[in-house]
Structure formats: structure tokens, C-alpha cells
Regions:
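Multi-pass alpha-helical transmembrane bundle typical of ion/small-solute transporters
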Residues: 1-283
Length: 283
């Protein structure tokens, strides 16, 4: 539940940032006001693409055999893990220039009187965030022990979007307590922890399919100290991949994951930004 709320919240804020930047720029430009209908049309098209992806995933899952579903869930969990890491790296690389890049695309549409270009730009941006949300949510559910109560999952998603609207409003105020930089820094850490959890969940599926050797199973037993099924241990299991009875292969690959993440972030952090543009000035 907490994972669903967090994922919807984080991705919705990012989508609102993109739409907010373009909306503000179009409203401030006399010629740009004609593009507002294309902006909202792009938002609708992007959401439709994300919903279509969700229906495809549900459809594929429904006609698979038990073993096929195990494979599909393993693949989706690992794909979601990779997508989270890619997203964090991309935002770290483009975050400070995102506003300028979006406005440049909008400016080009105005100059060429090509509003369909703006439509496509927005549709791709929203579809990207929506598709990431769909894959993350499916991967999160797949990495767990079951789909859970769909009504509760839907409620968590609605709550996540509501909190995203509030968060976006607070961030747009430009206060010192909550800034775009601090928001992305904190949520990047949480996303990477969640990606580690998705990795471990995917590995659990592969181990159950006898694809991966456990080497030693379990390598330790910490259930007497912290169970991974209740309380704090359950939260750590959901958000960081904690296991009270882990297989050695899972531990080794989890450590390898963090080494790769550290190397990627170090590589991206060492590359100079082209033109820093504070995102909080989007409106």
C-alpha cells in the first residue's frame, strides 16, 4: 500500500512539473495561448497510452499459466527495477535543464505554427510518466506475495495523486523548507531503495523457478530480531528488499545492484550541467 501511494505521488509530481512548465510558458506568451488546447489534448493522449499499457499487462497476465505468470512477474519486477534506476539517472542528468528544454520545444512549436509538435511533446512526456507508473505498480505487486485488495490499491493511488497535487502546490510556492532540489534528492534515495526491493522480489521469483542457484539458503536468520512480514521489518521488506531468511545469491546481487547504482550516479554527477535552470521558477 505504501509503495503504491509513494510511486503514484512521485510520478504524478514529475508529470505535474512538466505540464506546469509548459502551461505557464504558454499562458505568458500571447501566441502560446492558442496552444493550450493542444497541451490538454496531449495530456489526455498520454494518459490514454498509459491506461492502454495497463490493460495490455493485465490481459497478458490473465491468460498465462501459473509458471508463465511466475516468469512474467519476475520479468516485470526486474524491468521496473531497471526503469527506476534509469529514471533517477535521467533526472539527475537533465533535472537542471528540464525547464529550458521543454520551453525550447514549445518555442519551436510557436515559431513554426506547429501545434501538433506541442501535442506530441506533451503526450510523450505524460505517457512516459504514466507508463513508468504502470510498470512500477505492476512490478511492485508482482514482487510481493499477491495483488492484495484492489479497492485498497486504488484508494492508495487516489491518495497518492491527491498528495502529489498538494506537494506540487507547496513546491511552486518556492519555500525554504520544501524545494525542488530537496524533493528530488529525498525521493531519488527512496526510489533507489524501492528499486532494490523490486530486484529482490524478482530474484525471489527466479529462485522459485529454479533459474537461479541459491548457493546458501538461508545465509542467515534474523527473524528472531526483525521479521520481514510485520511491523518495521515489513516496511523495510517493501521499500528496501529486506529478507529475514535471504538466499546468498540475493544478497550478492543486491550488493552488486548498489555498487552499479553508486557508479552510475558518480558518473552522471561528474558531468557538468549545460545550463542550470531552477525548476521552482516554473511558475
Amino acid at each position: 500500500m505504501e509503495q503504491v501511494l509513494f510511486i503514484v505521488w512521485r510520478e504524478s509530481v514529475e508529470a505535474l512539473l512538466v505540464v506546469g512548465i509548459l502551461y505557464t510558458w504558454l499562458r505568458a506568451t500571447p501566441e502560446g495561448k492558442r496552444g493550450l488546447n493542444y497541451l490538454w489534448g496531449g495530456v489526455a493522449a498520454g494518459l490514454a497510452l498509459a491506461v492502454a499499457l495497463a490493460l495490455v499487462l493485465l490481459g497478458v497476465s490473465s491468460w498465462l499459466s501459473d509458471e508463465g505468470q511466475e516468469w512474467f512477474q519476475a520479468i516485470m519486477s526486474l524491468a521496473a527495477c531497471a526503469l527506476v534506476v534509469q529514471m533517477v539517472v535521467w533526472m539527475k542528468k537533465h533535472g537542471r535543464t528540464l525547464k529550458g528544454e521543454l520551453e525550447s520545444g514549445a518555442r519551436s512549436s510557436v515559431a513554426n505554427d506547429n501545434w501538433w509538435g506541442l501535442f506530441v511533446l506533451v503526450a510523450i512526456a505524460v505517457a512516459r510518466e504514466g507508463s513508468e507508473t504502470v510498470v512500477f505498480l505492476y512490478g511492485t505487486v508482482s514482487a510481493g506475495e499477491g495483488g492484495g485488495d484492489m479497492a485498497k490499491l486504488a484508494l492508495a493511488g487516489v491518495a497518492g495523486f491527491a498528495v502529489a497535487l498538494l506537494t506540487f502546490w507547496l513546491l511552486q510556492l518556492g519555500g525554504k523548507m520544501i524545494t525542488w532540489r530537496r524533493f528530488f534528492r529525498v525521493t531519488e534515495i527512496l526510489l533507489l531503495l524501492l528499486a532494490g526491493s523490486l530486484l529482490v522480489g524478482g530474484l525471489d521469483h527466479l529462485i522459485s523457478l529454479d533459474v537461479l542457484p541459491t548457493i546458501i539458503d538461508p545465509v542467515w536468520d534474523s527473524s528472531w530480531l526483525l521479521s520481514d512480514s510485520t511491523g518495521v521489518g515489513k516496511v523495510l521488506a517493501d521499500f528496501a528488499g529486506y529478507r529475514a531468511l535471504p538466499a546468498l545469491i540475493s544478497v550478492l546481487l543486491w550488493v552488486a545492484y548498489w555498487i552499479v547504482v553508486w557508479a552510475l550516479l558518480r558518473w552522471v554527477g561528474g558531468k557538468p550541467a549545460r545550463a542550470p535552470v531552477p525548476a521552482r521558477n516554473a511558475s
